């Protein structure tokens, strides 16, 4: 029997690449989508990329709704939580980003703890580390946090910071801190798996090209 992984956000850019890597590594993947209308496209995309989609399942989950979270982890050994809101333009109300990011992380962690999931991986961001510090030439580590109250902290950075802090708090309270792994990448670049329009393509079409800066914390998606 293949180990089963619950992967939230499989229809996203990063989630799709994670799903492909898991399937190619022999795992059974239970991917979450907001509605099942996306399932056929995800299945076709991963199949075209060479994955064995006979081990691909789908479950409907909403970051702001409790429905389905408990059953989504049944028979799963691992959970990878990559679903989190990301928008082209920062909303006027920061809670439009913060609420689903934090609430979705809370639901994922609580479901994992209740089901005794062996290992939880959270996709956070360098944005949860780098903002609100005095001076520009500091060496930052996992011990450092972005300051949510700093005027230099964007809505997105605040949402990622608070969501990651929620994950650590819940796993610590459950006595499971050592079973949580968090990655904090910078901008993730790489090829699209399908012909959908990612954020960069939409900005380009809008006449706002976004060339990569000379110095930044980029990561290639295959890393």
What is the role of each PLM region?
Residues 2-27, 32:
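N-terminal Rossmann NAD(P)H-binding glycine-rich loop of SDR-like oxidoreductase domains
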Residues 129-130, 178-199:
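Flexible, glycine-rich beta-alpha linker
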Residues 81, 85, 90-156:
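Conserved Rossmann-fold NAD(P)-dependent oxidoreductase catalytic core, especially the SDR/UDP-sugar
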Residues 150-180:
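Active-site Tyr-X1-5-Lys
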Residues 90, 147-152, 195-222:
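A conserved pocket-lining segment of Rossmann-fold NAD(P)-dependent short-chain dehydrogenase/reductase
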Residues 36-38, 47-103:
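NAD(P)H-binding glycine-rich loop region in Rossmannoid oxidoreductase-like domains
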